[in-house]
Design a protein with these regions (language model features):
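Conserved NTP-donor binding/palm subdomain of two-metal-ion nucleotidyltransferases/polymerases, i.e.
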Residues: 1-127, 133-376
Length: 376
């Protein structure tokens, strides 16, 4: 489909053949391209700095208007400066925790600092740093950060806290350094709900990669667990797959991991885990999108409904080019409505067997009680 989502996504591929680069260059050089739609989509997908970095790597920036290229360069430079601050902060935090014998396992964006998943250090957009710690060290770690000027992040309050017995959280309340505007989340598990039960903290620690960051010892997820964590986090916690809101930044990281670690990632084991938990449709569609948009080489299982879900996810953004006609104008709305109906159609499963809550909250009486208390 000729949408802004698809065209931006194709630019985010970690590598391109000469033929693929030529095809993409021809599409970007079309005079009817709507650059405002592309920029808006890159921003929505949290992928603008990475978009600029990949365009530079692929030699495609020449096809952009000069003012847009200059604007993207400024955003990329600002994000690079922000990431340098985050790297400095991570080194400081690790030094403090190392001195107290507190082991740290880096998650998500923080892990990319350790292995330089993105050669361009300004490419990855980050809102915070996620650190997994053994549960017995959480309070000491929190106290140490508060001694360094961190406070409870007033913006990091979930509306689902009203649910009694909620197991929605995977970390203690976020800590923000008010002066440096940096937030650190101290995790005791990798994710809440079903993803956290699929990939446990114990499993993560048992196969973690050991290394150093600026002289400080640190761990991060093995490539197999990292890919699994990415796919689960991108599609499950906030019902992203059901709502049709899977972010290109997450798909791009999935593709980057597959490209960086082709020997360490075991597709057969990956899909065995996914099938065991009945997630082959959302995760299979997610991997299919990575393959179609970003040339990811991971094998995907044959899923009968994958093409339908692919269309639902890919076609809900505005057209990439200015086109007249009722169909072109209303196609994104049509697919957004389809995603909304699909999401609402799954509400009974979400309510009675909620992936966001613990196993003890899956019975009908318990769920009705929680709903009643929330309304009251």
């Amino acid at each position: 489909p000729d949408t802004a989502y698809v065209l931006v996504g194709r630019c985010l591929a970690p590598s391109l053949t000469d033929i693929q680069r030529g095809d993409l260059a021809r599409d970007l050089a079309r005079p009817e391209i709507c650059w405002e739609a592309l920029l808006a989509e890159a921003n929505r997908q949290h992928a603008t700095p990475l978009w600029y970095a990949r365009l530079q790597e692929h030699g495609l920036l020449m096809h952009f208007p000069a003012d847009l290229a200059a604007y993207l360069a400024q955003l990329h430079a600002a994000n690079g400066a922000r990431n340098r601050m985050l790297r400095d902060e991570l080194a400081m935090v690790l030094e403090i925790f190392n001195a107290r014998g507190i082991p740290v396992l880096l998650l998500k964006g923080a892990a990319t600092f350790a292995d330089d998943l993105y050669p361009d250090r300004g490419a990855r957009l980050m809102s915070d740093m996620d650190l997994l710690l053994p549960e017995e060290h959480l309070r000491e770690a929190e106290r140490l950060l508060m001694m360094e000027g961190y406070v409870d992040d007033p913006t990091n309050i979930s509306p689902y806290d009203v649910w009694p017995g909620s197991t929605r959280h995977a970390h203690i309340p976020g800590l923000m350094h008010l002066k440096r505007k940096i937030t650190v989340e101290l995790h005791y598990k990798l994710a809440y709900g079903l993803p956290g039960r699929i990939l446990t903290a114990e499993a993560a620690w048992s196969s973690a990669v050991f290394g150093t960051f600026r002289g400080n010892t640190v761990f991060w997820l093995c490539p197999h667990h990292r890919l699994l964590h990415n796919a689960l986090h991108a599609t499950q916690p906030h019902r992203e797959f059901l709502q049709g809101k899977v972010r290109l930044a997450d798909i791009a990281e999935f593709a980057a991991l597959v490209a960086r670690y082709p020997k360490e990632i075991l597709p057969a084991h990956f899909w065995k885990v996914i099938r065991r938990h009945d997630l082959v449709t959302p995760i299979g569609t997610y991997a299919l999108m990575a393959r179609l948009l970003m040339r990811s080489v991971i094998k995907t299982p044959g899923i009968q409904q994958a093409n339908w879900h692919r269309d639902r996810l890919l076609q809900s953004s505005p057209p990439a080019a200015n086109r007249a006609g009722l169909l072109a104008a209303n196609r994104p709305l049509f697919w957004r409505v389809i995603s909304f109906v699909y999401d609402q159609g799954h509400l009974p499963a979400w309510t009675w067997r909620n992936v966001c809550y613990g196993d003890d909250q899956t019975s009908t009486p318990a769920r009705l009680g929680c709903i009643g208390r929330q309304i009251a």
